[in-house]
């Protein structure tokens, strides 16, 4: 399902959890490249957000968890999100939108175990999104485990984060060591 094994990274960091909860911003296709389809099949519950009507229609026909058809920059996340989520995906186009949404989330009332954030550094003319998102998530207590995920080892487009209070410390330590040596996402799947 996932483009570069994001779903497997989530499962690795959460020790194969089968009853998790996710929030997905930028769902796109319900299966192709989906970071939550496998999680849903494993019993996870969650909610997705997507702006494209044709993707929302497919999603509603093919997936069981709900989807919100909306411009993600126009949502009131204080009304939608509360408590703990095991996984957060932020993947909107262009990357300036992803950063704007990241900063809109209710960080005082929500926690996330694992976050995949698409910064599209390879296409970011300003070269600011990756640094700003990293500074922001670090300030919230998140740890960057897998920086600069790239499907082709060249086009860095995404960072993978965890909150140390919500993942196994041994797995976190092993992943941090491995991340120093790996660019390919496949190398991060060590523990399942």
Task: Map each language-model feature to its residues.
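SAM cofactor-binding core of SAM-dependent methyltransferases
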Residues: 1-78
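Conserved acidic-Pro-Pro-aromatic motif
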Residues: 36-45, 65, 83-90, 94-191
């Amino acid at each position: 399902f996932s483009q570069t094994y994001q779903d497997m990274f989530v499962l690795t960091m959460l020790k194969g959890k089968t009853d998790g909860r996710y929030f997905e911003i930028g769902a796109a296709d319900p299966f192709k490249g989906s970071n939550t389809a496998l999680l849903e099949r494993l019993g996870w519950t969650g909610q997705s957000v997507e702006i494209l009507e044709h993707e929302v229609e497919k999603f509603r026909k093919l997936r069981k968890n709900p989807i919100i058809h909306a411009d993600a920059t126009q949502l009131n996340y204080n009304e939608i999100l509360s408590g703990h989520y095991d996984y957060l995906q932020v993947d909107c186009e262009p990357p300036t939108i992803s950063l704007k949404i990241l900063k809109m989330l209710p960080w005082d009332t929500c926690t996330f175990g694992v976050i995949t954030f698409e910064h599209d550094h390879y296409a970011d003319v300003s070269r600011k999104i990756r640094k700003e998102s990293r500074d922001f998530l670090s300030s919230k207590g998140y740890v960057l485990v897998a920086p600069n995920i790239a499907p082709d080892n060249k086009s860095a487009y995404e960072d993978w984060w965890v909150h140390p209070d919500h993942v196994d410390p041994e797995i976190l330590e092993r992943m941090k060591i491995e991340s120093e040596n790996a660019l390919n996402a496949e190398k991060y799947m060590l523990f399942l």
